[in-house]
């Protein structure tokens, strides 16, 4: 703004005269207002620039008179003012200044400047910890601050949207009000802390008494008989995969008993491998039954997403058990048979038991195949896709174990037949090694598929695209980013996405529920920045609540259209 002074240090006091031009009807003498600043040594510099007059439609002229504190230049003689070049604005403003009689002698430059004043709200400093706007529920207020319901009656109550699907709104309190009430009731923070410790001790004793009473109640029911109807958990356990597992446990237990008798009678290594195979199947399927019973438990505070992964955990342990007990012992017995061959007795009973085992294992295999076909048809998958993706780990374990059992029976019968024909016991030992290899392959597949499921496997791409398109078709959504949809087991899906909402649509959704005339009247009554701030804070908070309601609406509609989606997390981008 001062090109002739930009290169000089500010060291000399300067005096500024402000002169305004009044309207023609109120033309008066000069009005001079001095102000002070610093300017460089030497010379007198005079500049003209104008400000808009907010009181009248005229220009305000300002004369800057620069005076040297010594009144001389470097050599002590008066220094003449330096005359900068005048601009077009200065040339246009000079005649007006002359007509007003306000141009002082020595004017060399005039500049017209428009100053725009910007009103800015003062920024509030909240600090590292700010809890004055935190809400707290009645249950938390009573538990954390040791208050009674009567203590909360006279506090400010605020209705907010509920985060739960079964309720639309619930009542909360300001945390600052609750803290103040707690200090009023207990007197100090130390007294409140002592009361909390006492209540924790009482709660611990209460939990111990509940556990003791539950044991007594169980003993009482066992003595007199439990007349309660069969629970939903037991009914669920006897359907679908639970039914398949229970059938497999019964059949494999009988097979183990008869194969063990045949091995004791014949001494066949292949028969020993088959007996161990049936024992491993029985133990693993009992473990699967435990996993199924635990997977249908309801979620609790420690496990908010439920226990559906217990099926995968049980199947994983089952795979490890098949490898250790089935494959390991079969290989060991086969190697010992090769190193130390033993004569084999009559194999007639062994053939009969193998034939019966083939029929029973085949029946269990058919039950597992039918159950998998039914489940795959329900989810729109092929039989192969359902098995490879391990959608139902318990049924998969039964299927693979029974398939391996049928193949193992055929392999053991073939090797025993070669031993009977040739009299060479090495064929029987090779049969034991073959059964062990078959069991090792099955266990490796089970370990791999269940590990993949426990790590968090994504759902099919077509299904994920369907969920994404449903959200993108909503008018309140601009775009969907960072979509993650994982299979939680038991046909449950967890969906997460970053949503870019259309602010105009959300705001219009809020305005459609308001009285526009009333809002217009509120706008017209705004006169000061404080009133404008209160107006924006009021409606801004309501718009944020509307945005939260839009998120809840999308989550609810997504669950209704896709029942397999149990948990939805939509993050505002």
Curated annotation (Swiss-Prot):
UniProt KW Oxidoreductase keyword: no
Membrane topology: Multi-pass membrane protein
Region (Disordered): 66-108
Coiled-coil parts of chain: none
Location(s) in or outside the cell: Mitochondrion membrane; Nucleus; Endoplasmic reticulum
Chemical reaction(s) catalysed: Zn(2+)(in) + 2 H(+)(out) = Zn(2+)(out) + 2 H(+)(in)
Gene Ontology process terms (BP): intracellular zinc ion homeostasis; regulation of mitochondrion organization; zinc ion transport
Bias (Low complexity) ranges: 90-104
TM spans (from-to): 244-264, 319-339, 347-367, 397-417, 429-449
GO MF annotation terms: antiporter activity; zinc ion transmembrane transporter activity
Pfam families given in the database record: Cation_efflux
Keyword presence, Transmembrane: yes
InterPro entries: Cation_efflux, Cation_efflux_TMD_sf, DNA-bd_dom_put_sf, SLC30A9, XPA_sf
Keywords, in A-Z order: Antiport, Endoplasmic reticulum, Ion transport, Membrane, Mitochondrion, Nucleus, Transcription, Transcription regulation, Transmembrane, Transmembrane helix, Transport, Zinc, Zinc transport
GO cellular component assignments: cytoplasmic vesicle; endoplasmic reticulum; mitochondrial membrane; nucleus
Motif LXXLL motif mapped to chain: 467-471
Homology family: Belongs to the cation diffusion facilitator (CDF) transporter (TC 2.A.4) family. SLC30A subfamily.
Function as written in the Swiss-Prot or TrEMBL entry: Mitochondrial proton-coupled zinc ion antiporter mediating the export of zinc from the mitochondria and involved in zinc homeostasis, zinc mobilization as well as mitochondrial morphology and health. In nucleus, may function as a secondary coactivator for nuclear receptors.
PANTHER family xref list: HUEL-CATION TRANSPORTER (PTHR13414), PROTON-COUPLED ZINC ANTIPORTER SLC30A9, MITOCHONDRIAL (PTHR13414:SF9)
The protein's name in its UniProt record: Proton-coupled zinc antiporter SLC30A9, mitochondrial
Organism of origin: Danio rerio
Lineage start: Eukaryota, Metazoa, Chordata, Craniata, Vertebrata
């Amino acid at each position: 703004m001062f090109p002739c002074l930009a290169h000089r240090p500010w060291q000399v006091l300067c005096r500024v005269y402000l002169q305004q031009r009044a309207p023609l009807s109120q033309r008066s003498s000069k009005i001079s207002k001095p102000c002070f600043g610093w300017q460089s040594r030497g010379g007198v510099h005079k500049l003209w620039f104008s400000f808009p007059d907010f009181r009248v439609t005229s220009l305000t002229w300002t004369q800057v008179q620069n005076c040297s504190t010594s009144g001389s230049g470097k050599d002590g003689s008066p220094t003449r003012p330096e005359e900068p070049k005048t601009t077009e604005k200065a040339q246009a403003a000079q005649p007006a200044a002359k007509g007003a009689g306000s141009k002082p002698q020595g004017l060399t430059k005039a500049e017209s400047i428009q100053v725009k004043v910007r009103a800015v709200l003062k920024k509030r400093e909240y600090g590292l910890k700010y809890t004055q706007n935190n809400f707290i529920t009645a249950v938390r207020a009573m538990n954390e601050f040791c208050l009674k319901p009567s203590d909360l009656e006279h506090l400010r109550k605020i209705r907010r949207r509920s985060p739960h699907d079964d309720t639309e709104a619930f009542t909360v309190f300001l945390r600052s009000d609750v803290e103040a009430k707690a200090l009023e009731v207990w007197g100090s923070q130390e007294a409140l802390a002592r009361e909390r410790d006492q209540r924790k001790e009482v709660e611990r004793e209460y939990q111990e008494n509940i556990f003791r009473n539950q044991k007594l109640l169980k003993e009482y029911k066992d003595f007199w008989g439990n007349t309660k109807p069969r629970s939903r958990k037991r009914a669920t356990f006897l359907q679908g995969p639970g039914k398949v597992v229970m059938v497999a446990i019964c059949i494999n237990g009988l097979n183990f008993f008869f194969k063990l008798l045949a091995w004791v009678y014949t001494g066949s290594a292949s028969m020993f491998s088959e007996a161990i195979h049936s024992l491993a199947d029985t133990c693993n399927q009992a473990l699967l039954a435990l996993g199924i019973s635990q997977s249908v438990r309801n979620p609790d505070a420690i496990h908010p997403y439920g226990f559906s992964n217990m099926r995968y955990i049980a199947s994983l342990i089952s795979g490890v058990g098949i490898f250790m007990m089935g494959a390991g012992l079969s290989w060991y017995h086969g190697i010992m048979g090769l190193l130390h061959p033993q004569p084999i007795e009559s194999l007639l009973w062994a053939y009969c038991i193998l034939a019966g085992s083939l029929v029973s294992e085949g029946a269990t295999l058919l039950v597992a195949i039918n159950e998998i076909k039914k489940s795959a048809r329900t989810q729109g998958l092929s039989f192969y896709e359902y098995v490879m993706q391990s959608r139902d780990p318990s049924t998969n374990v039964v299927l693979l174990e029974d398939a391996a059992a049928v193949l193992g029976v055929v392999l053991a019968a073939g090797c025993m037949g070669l031993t009977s024909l040739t009299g060479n016991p090495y064929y029987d030992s090779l049969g034991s090694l073959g059964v062990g290899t078959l069991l090792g392959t099955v266990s490796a597949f089970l370990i791999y598929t269940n590990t993949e499921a426990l790590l968090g496997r994504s759902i099919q791409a077509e299904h994920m695209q369907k969920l994404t398109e449903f959200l993108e078709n909503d008018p309140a959504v601009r775009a969907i980013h960072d979509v993650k949809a994982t299979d939680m087991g038991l046909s449950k899906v967890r969906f997460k996405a970053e949503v870019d909402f259309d602010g105009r649509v959300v705001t219009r959704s809020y305005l459609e529920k308001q009285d526009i005339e009333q809002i217009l009247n509120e706008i017209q009554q705004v006169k000061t920045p404080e009133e404008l701030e209160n107006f924006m804070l009021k409606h801004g908070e309501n718009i944020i609540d509307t945005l939260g309601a839009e998120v809840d609406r999308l989550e609810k509609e997504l669950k209704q259209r896709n029942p397999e989606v149990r948990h939805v997390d939509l993050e505002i981008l």
